[in-house]
């Protein structure tokens, strides 16, 4: 399909990762391209489709931002990997290990003795005016004494073929989960050649990554968690992925508090100590008490807990200072001062504008330099949030211009050269820094360097490191012994997660009930047409009671319910399967696309049935696949409570003395009990059979009594609140509900206090929320 002599156009003299200037393949690519030549267009499309489908099924996405609106988009995989020889990779790894050691020493100086400023090695203004240098942390030594545990670096190859470090990702490095998913997806595209070639595996690195976290809490005397900004953050997929992969709690700032100098998580079991926090928020937002006072992402008092060495933060707060572009002008000299070595991997040639010697040169060479804010952390060719307007010239950096190397991208059924950068990851281990033998490459959508941004249509590729050794055999098996106890964080349920699971159960059940009522109404509308019918009037009144009568009303109500369920589910994606999330996501999309097209009658009934099946699929997946931890119990509590409340609403109307003909059949249909009606009552729907099936039957999962007993059972299974009075209040409320429900046997159903039972159940819901969710 392709050879070195085909029309693969290089961009001038810019180095290409696949093809050398003489037209031959680089050694790392030769075997892969021999394989590629044998693939035809149809085979290629089929393979690429498998990789893309895997990513969709796994729920891998990124957030796209446009005009203030963020949307989820499919992960843009460049299906061809980038291949590098192990020898070249080793050179890069050695350089980055040295750089990681240098950055650690800089952190210790910046927040310690500050000798580099005192000795004139760096300008005081570059540190003192840096917004990421957090003064309250000066003099603070982290628990374990190390500041940095996990790093990422962006690299690019310049015109001469040398690799340059474009950015140090220290504050909250992202991308490692995407790198792993890229690997899985790409091996689905090219399973045969991947197995045939000797490609370095990623599993050993992730094993060491896991051990790094375990080593930070060897006594296993507390929890470990990821501190995330929440679902609207562009990296949220990765946060949930890593939480599930490493067995960490997924936490937001409001999930934490500080008690007597100790960081604790608010859980349904009470306050539990947190020993390790992998933060995915910028340091300035971590503690509104001492840092950014209007932050809603952090936890007041966190710095106090760090001072008492009660918690380890990965990476240390304040490490964002190392990402500033200004240090690229000083790192070569600082490496000599601190490590007594030459810097192995250099940045782009950079100068601080405050250097008088450079200012005298600049006017003659200004076309050779890119000018940017000194404290920016973006790649030099990316759009910057910082403006140069009004900035002190001493706070500006000049860097040499760069043309990135290119790599193959498959577009319009042919390979074309596109600019690329490389992201590499490092983790601290007891034996020193370990470099992941892979990573990901960002591929441009055009020949411009800034087109590598995902926001501009860039794509992402897996990176294969070709070796002459047999691939490592390594299984990420679960740890044993005491460490396994540390990883059972899925049993620890944050209060906020319990709240969201409870309401997820309620929203999905309410949506199920509304869809059933709408379907029943439109089925009868198709039967009776425009002729007035008391049963149609009855179903209309029920729809009005649910707020979904007019077409635009039921569209907005269903969209609201689906959106609310999505919002709750997005907060707890680490608590249930990808399949469950994808079904809910598809249901939300289908409601928004199908509901506006719905017409009255049979057409509507058919479309509503399709939506109802999606809703039932989610409930089935959760019921069958979700582990019976506390989270499942709170979700089930919400589901059972909402099912009772819905039954009470429509039975109050359909069992009334003035209910129209056909009301009993409608009640049975809404209760999804037609089959059992036929098997037990010969299909005869009357008040007796309806009450038996939908109120009293302890074996019918749709009946009120079945779900009330379920409520009682679930309440016994969730942790008891330490406040015995609150427990007693909930017990008394359920006892009142039981008394009201049993009163039917004495007084019949005509005088049954539907409203009293509904109101008492809502009181129980409020008590549950107050006890566990605040």
PLM region spans:
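Alpha-helical transmembrane segments and their helix-helix packing motifs
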Residues: 55-147, 158-160, 170-224, 230-241, ...
